[in-house]
Regions:
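Peripheral, non-catalytic segments flanking oxidoreductase cores
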Residues: 1-231
Length: 231
């Protein structure tokens, strides 16, 4: 994998949490990015979920719109093509996507802020598989926040109470074929409004990083690596 930032193994966190946390922190301070290998995310589950969404995004538009609720502001379920406009942009991105979030008990008070996930009954195991993958990413994010806390000289569990039942989302993005005459970008230069984001590689290269040190740099060849960045 060619990247300007380091690729570090999550196995090293168990061996020496201080050294792992220091290297993670150095990369975040310099680049805002770090690659994580041996991350524990089930790669077979990732492929299953990718296949599930291939089936979904190939559905006719009128079928996909059954799973779009404009009142949710894109918080859960389907968001159609050319709806989301990035921060500081004046044209919507040429993409469609699906959001999966945290599942809560029916009596949980946090339900007033977190809507239910949306199921697609026609796709077998849709909700089970997507929820399972969300939880794996959620656990990885929590562990990396422990490392960030250690790097900052805090107790490893410092962020636990802040992220407990946090309103995180797993976003699956599809960039449909476009005409050259269409205005807008797939996903132009932007900053995400997040604490920590985890990105898996798609089937085509696309991620580029803008840094003060090296200008625009493309990250390529990262099938087995999860890119972690801070927003």
């Amino acid at each position: 994998m060619h990247t300007p930032f380091s690729i570090i193994s999550l196995n090293d966190f168990d061996k020496d949490s201080s050294s792992f946390s220091e290297e993670l922190g150095i990369n975040f301070r310099k680049w805002g990015f770090c690659g994580i290998k041996d991350h524990g995310i089930d790669t077979e589950l990732v492929k299953e979920v990718q296949d599930i969404f291939k089936d979904f995004f190939n559905l006719p538009e009128e079928d996909k719109l059954h799973f779009f609720n404009p009142d949710l502001g894109g918080a859960r379920g389907y968001t159609p093509f050319k709806i989301e406009t990035p921060k500081d942009a004046n044209k919507p991105d040429l993409k469609e996507f699906w959001h999966v979030g945290r599942e809560l008990d029916s009596i949980d008070p946090f339900r007033q802020w977190m809507p239910d996930n949306i199921d697609i009954p026609s796709i077998p195991n849709f909700k089970h598989k997507t929820n399972e993958l969300f939880l794996q990413f959620d656990q990885l994010g929590s562990l990396l926040l422990q490392a960030i806390a250690i790097h900052l000289g805090l107790e490893g569990g410092y962020f636990d109470s802040h992220i407990n039942k946090g309103n995180s989302v797993m976003r699956v993005i599809h960039y449909p074929p476009i005409e050259l005459t269409q205005e807008g970008e797939r996903a132009g230069a932007h900053q995400d409004i997040v604490s920590v984001a985890l990105v898996i590689g798609g089937q085509q290269a696309g991620l580029a990083i803008l840094s003060q040190q090296a200008g625009g740099v493309r990250a390529t060849g990262w099938e087995d690596v999860i890119i972690c960045y801070i927003g």
